[in-house]
Amino acid sequence: MSERNQRKVYQGRVVSDKMDKTITVVVETYKKHSLYGKRVKYSKKFKAHDENNQAKIGDIVKIMETRPLSATKRFRLVEVVEEAVII
């Protein structure tokens, strides 16, 4: 297996695009509670590199793990899966 295929890929929603070439993506996951068995939702925010500033707030995007690009950026934008509907 090649090294690129072992990188983590997440799908999440853009919650901030105010920074230049950087977006904040919230990724929601569900885990089962060990004792009670109920599904519990967890969310985590990641900063991702957006070279062309193409992602906007509310978009569903796919991000991939990469080398550290700054103090907090460890992901890069792969694609915009679904664009947000602006009303």
Swiss-Prot record:
PROSITE patterns: RIBOSOMAL_S17. Keywords: Ribonucleoprotein, Ribosomal protein, RNA-binding, rRNA-binding. GO terms for biological process: translation. InterPro entries: NA-bd_OB-fold, Ribosomal_uS17, Ribosomal_uS17_bact/chlr, Ribosomal_uS17_CS. Signal peptide: none annotated. GO terms for molecular function: rRNA binding; structural constituent of ribosome. It comes from the Bacteria. Gene3D superfamilies: Nucleic acid-binding proteins. GO terms for cellular component: cytosolic small ribosomal subunit. One of the primary rRNA binding proteins, it binds specifically to the 5'-end of 16S ribosomal RNA. NCBIfam families: PRK05610.1, uS17_bact. Part of the 30S ribosomal subunit. Belongs to the universal ribosomal protein uS17 family. This is Small ribosomal subunit protein uS17. It comes from Bacillus licheniformis (strain ATCC 14580 / DSM 13 / JCM 2505 / CCUG 7422 / NBRC 12200 / NCIMB 9375 / NCTC 10341 / NRRL NRS-1264 / Gibson 46). The gene is rpsQ.
